[in-house]
């Protein structure tokens, strides 16, 4: 039974009438452009065929009832006429409540909803299960009540909910790609203007995500340190963000900067340039150049931004040794563990899976998780 069938069946069973709509919003993987988003730079993610699915129907009152199929059918119920506050014990409820609360501040022309939620985006793997949930909930209200909100506004609403209601400081990329993803395409996103450009993916190429299953510990504190170092760099150049600094300007005065800050700045500037070039390499179907850019990105994250760990580097090396110049591989996400992403010709996927299975656990003592994905459509009815 797929997620649509599962949520529709549970909806009818619990609520006693059929759902009128089923909505999906996908998770995502970032192909290149790491730690560039909060520097007003460029990112190149694609939506993946793992998603949050919600079967739903409008109510004729002001109550919102929610069932979380993946949490033993836990229930949340709240009124649109009372202040929406955080739930004491159910963290998943806060994503739903936060989205609804922030929607009310944007456009209050909606009533109650019944919904059943289920998803298969792996949690804690850096594939944006939370953004997928936020965008799915926003799309439910937009579709059921014909709200005049576009995908970018639904994405911004989700980001606001996560920043202000849930209390997690995230950029806009995850929600934007979940809302605006396009089948068989990646999306070049300008994180300053929120402008997007669809980039077609070469035919016969698989998007492979491998979770190192190395438990991330430093990610919060180190992430904040990196942001501060980038802001220090921007101040040195008297610019609002590193987006506004050229590599030439940096190279001319790099020796005057604190050496650690200089390394951080060099990563962001070079990564921005790589990301824009990667979009054009992908569009031309030049997988060899894309592979070189991904390798440079990984080396920059490892040596200049210093956010990889030995387990991640090992995983990247195993994949690279298997695919040679026929594809690309790099760490993806915030760093200090998490996942790697690889673009691999479909006929090489079994060889990569076998090499990783034989070598990674033997070298690190940890068993990986392997996902083969397709670039998928953003949020909407399913």
Curated annotation (Swiss-Prot):
Active site per UniProt: 174 (proton acceptor)
An annotated Gene Ontology molecular function: galactokinase activity
Record-level GO BP terms: galactose metabolic process
Annotated family: Belongs to the GHMP kinase family. GalK subfamily.
Role: Catalyzes the transfer of the gamma-phosphate of ATP to D-galactose to form alpha-D-galactose-1-phosphate (Gal-1-P).
Family matches, as HAMAP family: Galactokinase (MF_00246)
Protein name per its UniProtKB record: Galactokinase
Lineage, highest ranks first: Bacteria, Pseudomonadati, Pseudomonadota, Gammaproteobacteria, Enterobacterales
């Amino acid at each position: 039974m797929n997620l649509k069938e599962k949520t529709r069946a549970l909806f009818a069973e619990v609520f006693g009438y059929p759902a009128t709509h089923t909505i999906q919003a996908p998770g995502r993987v970032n192909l290149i452009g790491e730690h560039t988003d909060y520097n007003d730079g460029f990112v190149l993610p694609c939506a993946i065929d793992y998603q949050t699915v919600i079967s739903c129907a409008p109510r004729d009152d002001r109550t919102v009832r929610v069932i979380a199929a993946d949490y033993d059918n836990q229930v949340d119920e709240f009124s649109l006429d009372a202040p929406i506050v955080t739930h004491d014990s159910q963290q998943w409820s806060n994503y739903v409540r936060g989205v609804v609360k922030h929607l009310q501040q944007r456009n209050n022309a909606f009533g109650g909803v019944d919904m059943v939620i289920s998803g298969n985006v792996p949690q804690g793997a850096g594939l944006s299960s939370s953004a997928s949930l936020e965008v799915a909930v926003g799309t439910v209200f937009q579709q059921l009540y014909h709200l005049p909100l576009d995908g970018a506004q639904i994405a911004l609403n989700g980001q606001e909910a996560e920043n202000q209601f849930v209390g997690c400081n995230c950029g806009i990329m995850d929600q934007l790609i979940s809302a605006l993803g396009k089948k068989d395409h990646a999306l070049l996103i300008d994180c300053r203007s929120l402008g997007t450009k669809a980039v077609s993916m070469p035919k016969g190429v698989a998007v492979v995500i491998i979770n190192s299953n190395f438990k991330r510990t430093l990610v919060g504190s180190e992430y904040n340190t990196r942001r501060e170092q980038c802001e220090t760099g921007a101040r040195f150049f008297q610019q609002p963000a590193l987006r506004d600094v050229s590599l030439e300007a940096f190279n001319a005065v790099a020796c005057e900067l604190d050496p650690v800050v200089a390394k951080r700045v060099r990563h962001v500037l070079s990564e921005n340039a790589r990301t824009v070039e990667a979009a054009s390499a992908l569009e031309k179907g030049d997988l060899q150049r894309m592979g070189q850019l991904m390798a440079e990105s990984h080396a920059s994250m490892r040596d200049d931004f210093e956010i990889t760990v030995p387990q991640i580097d090992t995983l990247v090396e195993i994949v690279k040794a298997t695919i040679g110049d026929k594809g690309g591989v790099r760490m993806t996400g915030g760093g200090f563990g998490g996942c790697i992403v690889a673009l691999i010709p479909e006929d090489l996927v079994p060889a990569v899976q076998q090499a990783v299975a034989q070598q990674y656990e033997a070298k690190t003592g940890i068993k990986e998780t392997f996902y083969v994905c397709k670039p998928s459509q953003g949020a909407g009815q399913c």
